[in-house]
């Protein structure tokens, strides 16, 4: 019984430790552009059914409720909470924020398409629009070297002002991706996600089409992490960890008490001659 109780409390320690790790990661990314906070979800482990509901207690009566003992808890997953972050102005023409639904598409080095809310873009030596890491956005948009002014409309049309030209010239169209199940996306680091069978295939459209959001030029989407909320969760996690640790200590004391009592009962009594 004692070792079972210790095991249950240990599962609580492990679960709270995982939750603390997620909270720490949220706080570490409080200033990461486009970062989405995570929330840990718990579930109970299997129950030991010692007496079933309806079990006969006498000739005319039955047990009204079961006697079941839980065996602990575990972390089942960590959901990404894709609520909108604040739009912060940067006055940089190549900074873009998605206000609403949608992800930017980026070609990763391994050939996969990465999806991100981080719109910190720049140009490479060929004029292509890239992320800070140099990954080219998809579909590719090339800005002419002699462009004097760059404009990105709310529906994703990229236009530039060239020397001597009266009107701006359209050079590309930024498209967004969305998914049936955002939480099915697999985060891979560097603010990128990749699609999985759980997320479903990407739905591609221009900004402002259907339920897609709009683009905001000269701005970035800040993290949706609330420091106050994370600190409250941290204190709650710490208290839960301490309680589970205390449970282990209490069970250990109970076992030592039983061991000492059993020793006293089994020791032979010395006869006084």
Listing of model-derived features with the role each one plays in the protein:
Residues 1-262:
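Amphipathic alpha-helical polymerization modules
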